[in-house]
Amino acid sequence: FSAFVFKIQANMNKAHRDRIAFMRICSGEFEAGMNVYHVQGGKEIRLSQPQQMMASERKMITKAYGGDIIGVFDPGIFSIGDTLTTSKEKFAYEGIPTFAPEHFARVRQVDTMKRKQFVKGINQIAQEGAIQIFQEYNTGMEEIIVGVVGVLQFDVLKYRLNNEYNVEIRLENLPYEYIRWIENEDVDMDHLSGTSDMKKIKDLKDRPLLLFAHEWSIRMTEERNKGLILSEFGRS
């Protein structure tokens, strides 16, 4: 048996604050309650209460087969692109490409007393793949930068944080239009030579990235740092 997680949805039932991980079965047969190895988590887990969904209806299932899509309760351990398997030879499916956001904003909660709800909410929404969140290099979660493909996603973020987590936010638009993932594993961010319109950031997995306001800055940064490999797409 093998499967990969392609979608996560939080608060499908607001009364229970549930979180469902949707996975596609790639091979073998699934049985409710079976134990599988979560490759990215590095441990064996039990998949209980599997469901299939049609619109707002949920149906508990006992078996599923290759090609089927099932939803399982996620206590916060899954991420998009995760592999689950019963194979003795551990492997991982290639991650799902992450499209480069084109709009960026610094996000803060209006009520400082709701910091915990804010961090929880924005992390859960990011784990669904609806937005991407970043931190400035060498800072903590105090400064959060959100990246989206379309500006309407900022409105969706505002609504969901307010409606689902009771958190009001303030957005400060940033001038950056381009983002690049750094492929080099041994890059020294402190000594990376860039341009005045470049910002060093990191994602939730502490992977280094660069933001640019102008396209020419990307080429100049590559020229100033021989061997630097920049990618327009990341992987979940």
Predicted feature locations:
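A common structural junction motif
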Residues: 41-44, 88-93, 125-130, 161-170
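Conserved structured catalytic cores and adjacent interaction surfaces
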Residues: 64, 105, 132-188, 197
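Structural alpha-beta junctions
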Residues: 166, 235-236
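Conserved nucleotide-binding/hydrolysis modules and their immediate coupling elements
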Residues: 1-105, 119-120, 138-139, 143-145, ...
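Short amphipathic alpha-helix segments
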Residues: 113-127
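Intrinsically disordered or highly flexible coil/loop and linker segments, enriched in small
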Residues: 14-15, 131-132, 170, 218
